[in-house]
Amino acid sequence: MTTTLASRPDGEGSVQVKLDPKVNIEEGALVIAVYGKGGIGKSTTSSNLSAAFSKLGKKVLQIGCDPKHDSTFTLTHKMVPTVIDILEEVDFHSEELRPEDFMFKGFNGVQCVESGGPPAGTGCGGYVTGQTVKLLKEHHLLEDTDVVIFDVLGDVVCGGFAAPLQHANYCLIVTANDFDSIFAMNRIVAAINAKAKNYKVRLGGVIANRSADLDQIEKFNERTGLKTMAHFRNVDAIRRSRLKKCTIFEMDPEEEGVKEVQNEYLSLAKKMIDNVEPLEVEPLKDREIFDLLGFD
């Protein structure tokens, strides 16, 4: 007996569907969702990119979407309370909160919010992200924002952690020049393509991180239609900035590699401001990636 499953609209049955339209982020703001394989350096990349936008005179908000809530600590120089923790303290009566309860000013005026998440094995992180945006809207904290960056948990592409895609103009994918990172990137591309049918998000390109070479990334890009927007080599200054709990823009520019990295982040920010041409990308099947990547 063959069972035929009825076709369902994108995302049906998950929390990102039928969002209150009032939760949308204002038109005019540049909204970027940063994805990539777990541990690839998304938070470092997001924070340094936020800092770069601020150096270009933009009003920036970074939203960490990971229960670890460590997205913004290089901007704020500390671990800040999460939205979900603050809401629990007031029994989820958001009207009792003040902006300073959940939004924290970081380097060069970058505003920082950590959405947090439910306890392990319970609830949905995507719901928390939606509640965070709703809270920011209620307090009119998005009205004068030029750039919003969502730093998203790992390479999870379930309905919940695809929630930032509902708000984003562009998605940037952080990867390294290795098989596992590119394999994860391919899955993210497939998820974004699915969401792009219903939402305005489009692929902006690839950020190559901790990679001396780009041969495997470029091989994948050529097959799929992706494009490398920035290339950060395995520079020790980036690692040291994390240890110092600061952005790369707070490091001594005379130190080896610092100025080069700063300039690359500023260049990436300028490219995004200049309205990047969205990419038409076709993900590969798993077997195709195995056949494509690696050395002959």
From Swiss-Prot:
Pfam family, one: Fer4_NifH
Keyword match Iron: yes
Molecular-function GO terms, alphabetical: 4 iron, 4 sulfur cluster binding; ATP binding; metal ion binding; oxidoreductase activity, acting on iron-sulfur proteins as donors; oxidoreductase activity, acting on the CH-CH group of donors, iron-sulfur protein as acceptor
Disulfide bridge positions per record: none
UniProt KW keywords: 4Fe-4S, ATP-binding, Chlorophyll biosynthesis, Iron, Iron-sulfur, Magnesium, Metal-binding, Nucleotide-binding, Oxidoreductase, Photosynthesis
Residues where Mg(2+) binds: S43
Catalytic activity: chlorophyllide a + oxidized 2[4Fe-4S]-[ferredoxin] + 2 ADP + 2 phosphate = protochlorophyllide a + reduced 2[4Fe-4S]-[ferredoxin] + 2 ATP + 2 H2O
Cofactor binding: number and manner: Binds 1 [4Fe-4S] cluster per dimer.
SUPFAM superfamilies, A to Z: P-loop containing nucleoside triphosphate hydrolases
Residues reported to bind [4Fe-4S] cluster: C124, C158
Chain sites annotated for binding ATP: G39, I40, G41, K42, S43, T44, K68, N209, R210
Coiled coil stretches, renumbered: none
Catalytic class of the enzyme: oxidoreductase
Pathway: Porphyrin-containing compound metabolism; chlorophyll biosynthesis (light-independent)
Cofactor(s) annotated in UniProt: [4Fe-4S] cluster
Biological-process GO terms, alphabetical: light-independent chlorophyll biosynthetic process; photosynthesis, dark reaction
Biological role stated in the UniProt entry: Component of the dark-operative protochlorophyllide reductase (DPOR) that uses Mg-ATP and reduced ferredoxin to reduce ring D of protochlorophyllide (Pchlide) to form chlorophyllide a (Chlide). This reaction is light-independent. The L component serves as a unique electron donor to the NB-component of the complex, and binds Mg-ATP.
NCBIfam families: DPOR_bchL
Family affiliation: Belongs to the NifH/BchL/ChlL family.
Assembly: Homodimer. Protochlorophyllide reductase is composed of three subunits; ChlL, ChlN and ChlB.
Descriptive protein name: Light-independent protochlorophyllide reductase iron-sulfur ATP-binding protein
Organism encoding this protein: Prochlorococcus marinus (strain MIT 9211)
